[in-house]
Each structure stands twice: as C-alpha cells, then as structure tokens.
Amino acid sequence: AYTNLLKLVSPEQASRVAFLGFMYPFARQNNFQNQALILTNSDQIEHLESIVSEVPTMHYHIGAITEMSSRLMDLAKYSNVSLYPNITTEQVKRLYQEADFYLDINHQNEILSATRAAFENNLLILAFTNTSHGPDYTAPSNIFSAMNAGQFKQTLKEALGNRDFLSHLLDRQREHAHVATPEDYKKVIG
C-alpha cells in the first residue's frame, strides 16, 4: 500500500510520507530453549526424519488437529520427539510458550495460522521454499531450498548453539516483517 501511495503523490508530497511498519501484539520473548514446534495435518513433512536424527539436541513437538498417520506415529521412536494427535487449543497455547523455534516444513495447508502465531510468540521460523506458509513473517534468509536441507540443518544447529546468532536471526525476521514500535510512531507523528 505504501509503495502504491508513493506512485499517486507528487515528489513534494512523497517527501512528507513515511512508512511506519506494523505494531504486533508480541506475547513473549524468545527464551533460547531447544524446543521446536511443528503444526500439521499432513504426514508429508519435508526432511523431518533427517532433521530429527541429525539435530538431536532439539526437542520436536509435532501437533495435528486430526489423528496422525502411522508414518508420523512412528516418530515416537525418537526420544526427542513428542507427538500430539488431536491437539487441543490449550496444548497449542502451551507449546507456543515452551517452544522457541517454529519449523514451517509441512506440506499441504497451514493450520491454526501457525506462522503468524509463531511470529507473535517470537519463535524463530525456519522453512523450505516448497513448504513456507508465512513468507510475510519468515525472513527470506530463513527459507531454504528443499534441495539444500543441509543448510537448513546447519542454521538450526548454529542457532541452537549460539544465542547471539539466534538473536540476529530473530532481528532479521522482525525487520522483514516491518515491526515498528510506539517510539517509531512517535518519531514520525510527534
């Protein structure tokens, strides 16, 4: 809308127009915990088993509002996986409080506006190009080619082991989503 507005006004008017960004209702801060959330109604989750096995220091919470297929239920063999078939609203809320990463790696439709909720809970969102449901909330540098799952896993490992790196990725995520503060508005409006 801002770009379209600039096309409609004179250069003089454009000099008095500023893009302010968006104020989001952030529910919490990221606590730098090794807890990841995946919400899905599909058992088609890009590179899930290799991520779980190659990044074992992360605990993966996988929830679905439906029953889970045997393919997903088989992941219970991993000690770092918790499954939530027929997940309740209360469980979802609790997991958004506990997790600090959201892996947007499920194929098919997004459920429960998951990426927006993850963003508003300050979870770092990582996705693949063929699974990303929330590009407005996911920094482009955090969206990986499915052919480059190794880079996805490396970024996840680095973020787990380096609080400064995780903070940097969260800053890029907020910048991409044009997060503004009340102070930003006061500077422009007065």
Residue ranges and their predicted role:
Residues A1-R16:
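A short, active-site helix/loop in glycosyltransferases that binds the activated sugar's phosphate group
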Residues R16-K77, N86-T89:
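Conserved catalytic-core segment of nucleotide-activated headgroup transferases in glycan assembly
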Residues T88-A99, E120:
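Short acidic alpha-helix that forms the nucleotide-activated donor recognition element
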Residues V92-K93, E110-L112, N130-Y137:
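Short glycine/proline-enriched, acidic/aromatic patches that form the donor-sugar handling elements
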Residues Q97-E110:
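Acidic donor-binding loop of glycosyltransferase active sites
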Residues L124-T129:
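Short hydrophobic beta-strand element within catalytic cores of glycosyltransferases
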Residues M147, L160-G190:
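A charged, aromatic-enriched C-terminal amphipathic alpha-helix characteristic of glycosyltransferases
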